[in-house]
Amino acid sequence: MSRSRINGNFLDKTFSIVANILLRIIPTTSGEKEAFTYYRDGMSAQSEGNYAEALQNYYEAMRLEIDPYDRSYILYNIGLIHTSNGEHMKALEYYFRALERNPFLPQAFNNMAVICHYRGEKAIQQGDSEIAEAWFDQAAEYWKQALALTPGNYIEAHNWLKITGRFD
């Protein structure tokens, strides 16, 4: 039985039902359908905190998925898992790869900025203000890109940019 079918979450069930209907009525290849099934199962496992299973499903979806736009979301979700696991450099790599395929993912820019800001805070704690400033400058660039794509979102980031004098 597919993982998403046993998930008790109402939203996941609703998503699965709608997705299954769309897969039946929209002309897609069997490979595309299989890729989406792995992606959907990956999201289900991820929402339950089962990151190892989610990654297995996402990697299989990546093997099958050919559409760059769809691949960007798979890569983004892999980045989320690495972020959750504290593997920040690996997460940044996956966010970059997602943005190469879809440069209109403000959430990827935001997550990259959050990681850079976190690394800047860690550098301050270690007494390295020069490294901290470099991380903060990079965070600012990513937040500016996220804000350019979605004006009005990321209000805390917008305020931080203003307070720190990094907003143009």
Swiss-Prot record:
PROSITE patterns: TPR, TPR_REGION. This is Photosystem I assembly protein Ycf3. GO terms for cellular component: plastid membrane; thylakoid membrane. Keywords: Membrane, Photosynthesis, Plastid, Repeat, TPR repeat. One of its GO terms (biological process) is photosynthesis. HAMAP family: Ycf3 (MF_00439). The keyword Chaperone does not apply. The keyword Cytoplasm does not apply. Signal peptide: none annotated. It is a peripheral membrane protein. Its main location: plastid. Essential for the assembly of the photosystem I (PSI) complex. May act as a chaperone-like factor to guide the assembly of the PSI subunits.
